[in-house]
């Protein structure tokens, strides 16, 4: 049965699908007051992911983070009611090497907003654990929102066996080893995105991006140091460094 047109929760009407991930589909929706919303509907056997995203995202309140409003059910499947984030996923929004084109200002603003969102998350003792282009929605002016918390959890969280969390191209070395992750692990992903913006391509897995003969090189190196004990792990400091090097006022 088509989901579009169905009403879930307290008067939230599903309108159209926005996108699909490996274990969920997201619908654009409108609540009873006419406000745009998103509803993330999980495959039935991924109920634990829905629970994790609810636990991590429900208390977050930052303009650059999508908010998890409540748990709902769609045809018996676990689902979450979210604030609606505008924009396109990062790799769809930007063409090759945006940090070296007329898009530089917008792209660096996207990264600054991402760092602001991560700073709020880290301040609550949480790590995102899947910083990647598909989880960053960017608008035409560069404004950005970080989404998807179904892999998120407490910093330093341990599991019964080594667990590799995240997406390979953006994983920190410690994530590939299955170690507990911290704020510096999220910032490694930001560094990979900065490197992509400067070089126009993702390098070999596990190899930090090389210098780009750009004023942003020192920040790039600090974010992608393979040794997590030396890597920059303070999102607020990284954001201020980025803004200073980029000459951005915000």
Predicted regions and their residues:
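Activation-segment/catalytic-loop signature of the eukaryotic protein kinase fold
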Residues: 71
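ATP-binding glycine-rich loop module of kinase domains
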Residues: 23-25, 30-48
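AlphaC helix of the eukaryotic protein kinase fold
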Residues: 46-59
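Conserved short submotifs of the Hanks-type protein kinase catalytic core
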Residues: 75-89
């Amino acid at each position: 049965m088509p989901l579009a047109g169905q009403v879930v929760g307290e008067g939230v009407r599903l309108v159209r699908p926005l996108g699909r991930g490996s274990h969920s589909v997201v619908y654009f929706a409108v609540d009873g007051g006419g406000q745009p919303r998103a509803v993330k509907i999980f495959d039935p056997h991924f109920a634990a992911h829905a629970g994790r995203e609810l636990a991590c995202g429900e208390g977050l309140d930052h303009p650059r983070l999508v908010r998890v409003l409540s748990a709902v059910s769609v045809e018996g499947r676990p689902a979450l009611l979210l604030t609606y984030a505008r924009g396109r996923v990062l790799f769809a929004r930007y063409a090759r090497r945006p940090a070296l084109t007329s898009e530089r200002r917008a792209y660096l603003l996207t990264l600054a907003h991402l760092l602001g969102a991560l700073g709020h998350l880290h301040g609550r003792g949480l790590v995102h654990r899947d910083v990647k282009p598909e989880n960053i929605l960017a608008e035409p002016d560069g404004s950005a929102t970080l989404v998807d918390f179904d892999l998120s959890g407490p910093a330093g969280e341990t599991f019964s066996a080594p667990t590799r969390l995240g997406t390979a191209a953006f994983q920190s070395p410690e994530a590939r080893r299955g170690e507990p992750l911290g704020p510096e692990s999220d910032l490694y992903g930001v560094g990979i995105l900065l490197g992509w913006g400067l070089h126009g391509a993702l390098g070999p897995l596990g190899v930090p991006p090389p210098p780009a003969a750009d004023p942003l090189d020192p920040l790039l190196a600090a974010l992608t140091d393979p040794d997590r004990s030396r890597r920059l792990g303070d999102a607020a400091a990284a954001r201020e460094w980025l803004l200073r090097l980029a000459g951005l006022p915000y």
